[in-house]
UniProtKB/Swiss-Prot annotation:
Possesses an unusual extended V-shaped dimeric structure with each monomer consisting of three distinct domains arranged along a curved 'spinal' alpha-helix. The N-terminal catalytic domain specifically recognizes the glutamate moiety of the substrate. The second domain is the NADPH-binding domain, and the third C-terminal domain is responsible for dimerization. This is Glutamyl-tRNA reductase. It comes from Xanthomonas campestris pv. campestris (strain B100). The record marks H91 as: Important for activity. PROSITE patterns: GLUTR (PS00747).
Length: 432
């Protein structure tokens, strides 16, 4: 089995394609259940955020994974990147550290990777291979953030949106801000807004209790999402980030709100993928809409300023990838020995139990021992005997040579190690 990662992100695919590729809400567990039915896939995990959808899998053939993703969202194949084995390990380490994020070093992605691991494990989609990889990923990401400043003073998409709002409204503290949703992105936006102060903070969410919790923490007013129409016109700035599959803020709603506001400008930030705000809202006069793709350009300055710390983190990741791959290769080299030992132990235990039963039934000890020795010899030597017979028929000299070393003619004899040529350095110019 090979480790594969297939995915798309903000660098390879536009937002409309990313929103079709996203696995929101209950779609993620269902997708994992679907992957588990594929005979070519042994283990799988899905990472789905506003900026990326990635499939991590232990599988024989990546085309099976490509076909599965294309069935989920037709047209993805031309936008997918693909990594295997060591490069797949490197990719996950970089993602979890925030080196592959729109906002370099963002802290939220590590939590999202942990969520992907937890969901995959809860649904039985993880095996020892991916589980070990994710555990190592968490350790590497923590070290990279501790040993470098890649995560210092992190700038998130939410904080970037708040900064743009502050630049657009010189007196944001005299404005009304509406937050739609109550997830992590909206929590971050609320935190940054409360630090800068706003005149009034409205928080609308499908689950009112979640909105109330956030409102209590940041001095806002909680609203059920069903009352969005009534309060949209009050908002000078709107931040929206829900997990809805369809837009929660429509063009019709914004048009009505602008009429009520008597064409007073409204600034809207759509921080969700799939998008929360209908794209055609950007066509309206006095409505200024930013999507996550627009914000990528706004955070490029931050990316440049943190490149030195990122280079240090990359060096840590390079070292950790090499160590991880070395450990995997060592385990692979030990695997035949472990299988051989397990085969010998299980054979011994099975035949010994049978011999003890025969003794307890009164069978003569000499006869039992004779049968035990004969059975052990046959059972243990049958696999190598069959393999050597095939090797002789197929002229497999490598296997027959290995057998000579494993089973020498003289019992107890050990073959000498393979000689290594010695290069003399004391006679650099020998006489002709």
């Amino acid at each position: 089995m090979t480790l594969w990662v297939l995915g798309l992100n903000h660098q390879t695919a536009p937002v409309d394609l990313r929103e079709r590729a996203a696995f929101a809400g209950d779609a993620l567990p269902r997708a994992l259940d679907s992957l588990r039915t594929l005979p070519q896939v042994r283990e799988a995990a899905l990472l789905s955020t506003c900026n990326r959808t990635e499939l991590y899998a232990m599988a024989d053939d990546p085309q099976t994974l490509v076909a599965w993703l294309d069935m989920h969202a037709p047209g993805l194949s031309g936008y997918l990147y693909q990594h295997r084995d060591a490069e797949a390990v490197r990719h996950l380490f970089r993602v979890a550290t925030g080196l592959d994020s729109m906002v370099l070093g963002e802290p939220q992605i590590l939590g999202q990777v942990k969520d992907a691991w937890a969901v995959a494990r809860a649904h039985g989609a993880l095996g020892s291979g991916l589980d070990r990889l994710f555990q190592q990923t968490f350790s590497v990401a923590k070290r990279a953030r501790t040993d470098t400043r890649v995560g210092a003073n992190p700038v998130s998409v939410a904080s970037t949106a708040v900064r743009l709002a502050q630049e657009s409204f010189a007196r944001l503290n005299e404005s009304t801000v509406l937050l739609v949703g109550a997830g992590e992105t909206i929590e971050l936006a609320a935190k940054h807004l409360s630090e800068g102060r706003v005149r009034r903070l409205l928080i609308a969410n499908r689950t009112l209790a979640h909105a109330q919790t956030l409102a209590t923490q940041h001095g806002g007013v909680a609203l059920p999402l069903t009352e969005l129409d009534r309060h949209l016109a009050e908002a000078d700035v709107v931040f929206s980030a829900t997990a809805a599959r369809e837009p929660v803020v429509t063009r019709v709603q914004v048009e009505q709100a602008l009429r009520t506001r008597k064409r007073k400008p409204m600034l809207l930030f759509d921080l969700a993928v799939p998008r929360d705000i209908e794209a055609s809202v950007a066509e309206l006069s006095d409505a200024y809409l930013y999507t996550v793709d627009d914000l990528e350009r706004a955070v490029e300055d931050n990316r440049r300023s943190r490149r030195e710390a990122a280079d240090q983190a990359e060096a840590i990741i390079d070292l950790q990838v090499a160590r991880y791959v070395e450990t995997l290769q060592a385990n692979e080299r030990q695997a035949p020995l472990k299988r051989l030992r397990a085969f010998g132990d299980s054979t011994r235990d099975e035949l010994l139990a049978k011999a003890r039963q025969q003794l307890s039934n009164g069978k003569p000890a000499d006869e039992v021992l004779e049968q035990l020795a004969h059975a052990l010899t046959n059972r243990l030597l049958h696999p190598p005997t069959a393999a050597l017979r095939d090797a002789a028929l197929n002229n497999d000299l490598d296997l027959t040579s290995a057998a000579d070393r494993l089973f020498p003619e003289k019992p107890g004899y050990r073959h000498p190690p393979v000689a290594t040529p010695i290069v003399r350095t004391d006679d650099a110019n020998p006489a002709p």
